[in-house]
Amino acid sequence: MRFKIKKCPKCGEYTLKETCPLCGEKTKLAHPPKFSPEDPYGEYRRRLKKETLGIGVKK
């Protein structure tokens, strides 16, 4: 079963459409991806998050 409900990242409106009816922004899936214990991209995702937040990054 595919998820159909989407959420606008700009205004937070939930919809079934590809674009937000209120602001016209492209919507994204409202559900997180499935959890996998063998997360193949976990290391990269955590590294990106640390870099984005500036944690443990040498400047």
Curated annotation (Swiss-Prot):
Protein name, UniProt field: Ribosome biogenesis protein Nop10
Function: Involved in ribosome biogenesis; more specifically in 18S rRNA pseudouridylation and in cleavage of pre-rRNA.
Protein's GO biological process: pseudouridine synthesis; rRNA processing
Keyword rRNA processing: yes
Single GO MF descriptor: snoRNA binding
Gene3D superfamilies: H/ACA ribonucleoprotein complex, subunit Nop10
Record-level GO cellular component terms: ribonucleoprotein complex
Superkingdom in the source lineage: Archaea
Family under the similarity heading: Belongs to the NOP10 family.
Pfam family of the protein (one): Nop10p
Protein keywords: Ribonucleoprotein, Ribosome biogenesis, rRNA processing
InterPro entries, per the entry: H/ACA_rnp_Nop10, H/ACA_rnp_Nop10_sf, Nop10_arc-typ
